[in-house]
Amino acid sequence: MIAGIGIDVAEIDRIKRAVEKTPSFINKVLTKGEQAQLATLKNQRYYEYIAGRFSLKEAYSKALGTGIGRHVSFLDVEIIDNELGQPVVVSHPFDGPAHASVSHTGQLVFTEVILEKGE
């Protein structure tokens, strides 16, 4: 049974500017595991990854119904790409499965997260 659905869109250039202006942005948004994956990426893919994780975590918080803030932070959710490149939610506060999807254009990242609960 679906417990929540969240979607989000992020501008890659906006995230790139945030990282360039405040390099600690990465530490506020990405877990150590996500930062390890990020370290393997270069050029545009580097910023797509950061924007994607930012947007996925926003979508997750919307699916949870709380938004980012008091009840869930960016670092409470870890999303790691599997060997096929699929984003997998490996750590999160919701008691049930979480499914994530991300898509990129040259300028935008679109994300969706679905939370499931048992019946």
From Swiss-Prot:
GO BP term, example: fatty acid biosynthetic process
One Gene Ontology cellular component annotation held by this UniProt entry: cytosol
EC number(s) on file: 2.7.8.7
Keywords assigned: Cytoplasm, Fatty acid biosynthesis, Fatty acid metabolism, Lipid biosynthesis, Lipid metabolism, Magnesium, Metal-binding, Transferase
Residues that, per the record, bind Mg(2+): 8, 58
Entry keyword Metal-binding: yes
Enzymatic reactions: apo-[ACP] + CoA = holo-[ACP] + adenosine 3',5'-bisphosphate + H(+)
Gene3D superfamilies: 4'-phosphopantetheinyl transferase domain
Cofactor entry: Mg(2+)
Main location as per UniProt: cytoplasm
Places the protein is found: Cytoplasm
GO MF term list: holo-[acyl-carrier-protein] synthase activity; magnesium ion binding
Pfam families noted in UniProt: ACPS
UniProt signal peptide: none
InterPro entries reported for this sequence: 4-PPantetheinyl_Trfase_dom, 4-PPantetheinyl_Trfase_dom_sf, ACPS, P-Pant_transferase_sf, Ppantetheine-prot_Trfase_dom
HAMAP family attached to this UniProt entry: AcpS
Reported function: Transfers the 4'-phosphopantetheine moiety from coenzyme A to a Ser of acyl-carrier-protein.
Protein family: Belongs to the P-Pant transferase superfamily. AcpS family.
Name of the molecule in the record: Holo-[acyl-carrier-protein] synthase
Origin organism lineage: Bacteria, Bacillati, Bacillota, Bacilli, Lactobacillales
